[in-house]
């Protein structure tokens, strides 16, 4: 059987004024990805699918984000905000090309899943003209109610127009719909604006379908999945739901979370097996963690690749461009950025390793700094395999430390060090016999010590 073709239209033209932000609403993040990115990721993809995003005027950033996530996305501008049906018809050109299934979603519902989109499409394959997504609301006040007769949806009644009995209905409209693509324009073009706001409401499609003698059905999902984001408080609620999902998925995949509610993950985090994460860890976007790795408490990791059996933290910060080989160790109060640390490297305490490559099995002593910035440009430090860098050393880039080289503690290294060489740079130590006793005596007499 040939797979059904689909067009997903994502409505993302809203101003989001209640967010109190200069950022378009759909570009706010949940689990380190934009609201829009979550919806576009869940939308059908692959052969026979197409995607349209309806944006508002002057929302080029939204168009750019859509194409970043889904290069196949085509954007359309809703010049005037005259209701949801009006927004859908902004993409008339895409609808007119003809598909089996037309899906209509909202760019501010980041919790919707690919599985729900698939369930919503299923009735269309069986002849339904429209399938509407609904949920059982804990508090239905303010939502449109689904009026059903048997298995059929006959109307969506807004709160203001609902009777006393209809207001008792807890099956509410999520706004997401699937419409038979071959009948979509015939339905949408019949929607009028004879209402107090003079707007074109997508919900009117249900009664138009009924008038035509066609079938509309309801597909139920959880209230969490169709949460719309209009305020920063709702954004925080969605974050909480998403984090709970991500934590559960991680643990089901074999990750040990010691205190799950204290760990914050990104939607794109990739875990191997037998990974352990201690309390109060933040994992930002672009992080991949291989088997057996342990992340200790209060570590913050972004755009980083961790090999197998790596140990991180506690109190470590791994910034973008960090890559750690198998068995590498990053200890407490260590920061890395744009750094490749090969297998077995140890940076156990109080160090900054930036714009650097560290060869396998090298040891970087406490307090070591790669001095990568000269006030104008960043420069690279290259440390060979099996090197030993003593504590409190400064490596002034650009500089190369050879394989097996030793750097004495307290050194400021400004020139390349050959393989197996020892480099030591510090002032000669001066010892004055009895000097401490004389100093104390002078201080107690209120006199300055002799030079």
From Swiss-Prot:
It is an enzyme of class 2 (transferase). GO terms for molecular function: glucosamine-1-phosphate N-acetyltransferase activity; magnesium ion binding; UDP-N-acetylglucosamine diphosphorylase activity. The keyword Transmembrane does not apply. Residues 254-451 are annotated as: N-acetyltransferase. The active site is at 349 (proton acceptor). It catalyses: alpha-D-glucosamine 1-phosphate + acetyl-CoA = N-acetyl-alpha-D-glucosamine 1-phosphate + CoA + H(+); N-acetyl-alpha-D-glucosamine 1-phosphate + UTP + H(+) = UDP-N-acetyl-alpha-D-glucosamine + diphosphate. One of its GO terms (cellular component) is membrane. Binds 1 Mg(2+) ion per subunit. Pathway: Nucleotide-sugar biosynthesis; UDP-N-acetyl-alpha-D-glucosamine biosynthesis; N-acetyl-alpha-D-glucosamine 1-phosphate from alpha-D-glucosamine 6-phosphate (route II): step 2/2; Nucleotide-sugar biosynthesis; UDP-N-acetyl-alpha-D-glucosamine biosynthesis; UDP-N-acetyl-alpha-D-glucosamine from N-acetyl-alpha-D-glucosamine 1-phosphate: step 1/1; Bacterial outer membrane biogenesis; LPS lipid A biosynthesis. Mg(2+) binds at residues 108, 230. Residues 233-253 are annotated as: Linker. Residues 1-232 are annotated as: Pyrophosphorylase. InterPro entries: Bifunctional_GlmU, GlmU-like, GlmU_C_LbH, Hexapep, Hexapep_transf_CS, MobA-like_NTP_Trfase, Nucleotide-diphossugar_trans, Trimer_LpxA-like_sf. Its cofactor is Mg(2+). Homotrimer. In the N-terminal section; belongs to the N-acetylglucosamine-1-phosphate uridyltransferase family. In the C-terminal section; belongs to the transferase hexapeptide repeat family. NCBIfam families: glmU, PRK14353.1. HAMAP family: GlmU (MF_01631). This is Bifunctional protein GlmU. It comes from Bradyrhizobium diazoefficiens (strain JCM 10833 / BCRC 13528 / IAM 13628 / NBRC 14792 / USDA 110).
């Amino acid at each position: 059987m040939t797979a059904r073709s689909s067009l997903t239209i994502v409505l993302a033209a809203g101003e989001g004024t209640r967010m109190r932000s200069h950022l378009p609403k759909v570009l706010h993040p949940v689990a380190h990805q934009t609201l829009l990115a979550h919806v576009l990721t869940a939308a059908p993809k692959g052969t026979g699918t197409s995607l349209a995003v309806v944006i508002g005027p002057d929302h080029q950033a939204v168009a750019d984000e859509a194409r970043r996530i889904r290069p196949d996305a085509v954007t359309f501008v809703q010049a005037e905000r005259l209701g949801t049906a009006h927004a859908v018809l902004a993409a008339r050109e895409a609808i007119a090309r003809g598909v089996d299934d037309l899906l209509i979603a909202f760019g501010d519902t980041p919790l919707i899943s690919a599985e729900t989109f698939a369930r919503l499409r299923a009735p269309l394959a069986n002849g339904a003209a429209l399938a509407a997504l609904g949920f059982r609301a804990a508090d239905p006040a303010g939502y449109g109610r689904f009026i059903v007769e048997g298995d059929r949806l006959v109307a969506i009644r807004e709160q203001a127009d609902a009777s006393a009995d209809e207001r008792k209905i807890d099956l509410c409209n999520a706004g997401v719909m699937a419409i038979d693509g071959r009948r979509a324009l015939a339905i949408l073009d019949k929607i009028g604006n004879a209402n107090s706001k003079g707007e074109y409401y997508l919900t009117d499609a249900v009664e138009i379908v009924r008038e035509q003698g066609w079938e509309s059905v309801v597909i139920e999902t959880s209230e969490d999945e169709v949460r719309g984001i209009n305020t920063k408080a709702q954004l925080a609620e969605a974050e909480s739901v998403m984090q709970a999902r991500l934590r559960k998925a991680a643990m089901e995949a074999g990750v040990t979370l010691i205190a799950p509610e204290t760990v914050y993950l990104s939607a794109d985090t990739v875990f191997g097996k037998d990974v352990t994460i201690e309390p109060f860890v933040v994992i930002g976007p672009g992080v991949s963690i291989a088997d057996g790795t342990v992340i200790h408490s209060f570590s913050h990791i972004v755009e980083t690749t961790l090999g197998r059996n790596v140990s991180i933290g506690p109190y470590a910060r791994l910034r973008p461009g960090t890559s750690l080989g198998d068995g590498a160790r990053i200890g407490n109060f260590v920061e890395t950025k744009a750094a490749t640390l090969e297998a077995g490297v140890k940076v156990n305490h109080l160090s900054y390793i930036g714009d650097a490559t560290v060869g396998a099995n090298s040891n970087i002593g406490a307090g070591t700094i790669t001095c990568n910035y000269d006030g104008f440009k960043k420069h690279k430090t290259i440390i060979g395999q099996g090197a030993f860098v003593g504590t409190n050393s400064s490596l002034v880039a650009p500089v190369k430390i050879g394989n097996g080289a030793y750097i004495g503690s307290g050194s400021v290294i400004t020139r390349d060090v050959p393989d197996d060489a020892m480099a030591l740079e510090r002032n000669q130590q001066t010892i004055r016999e009895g000097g401490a006793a004389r100093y104390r005596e002078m201080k107690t007499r209120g006199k300055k010590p002799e030079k």
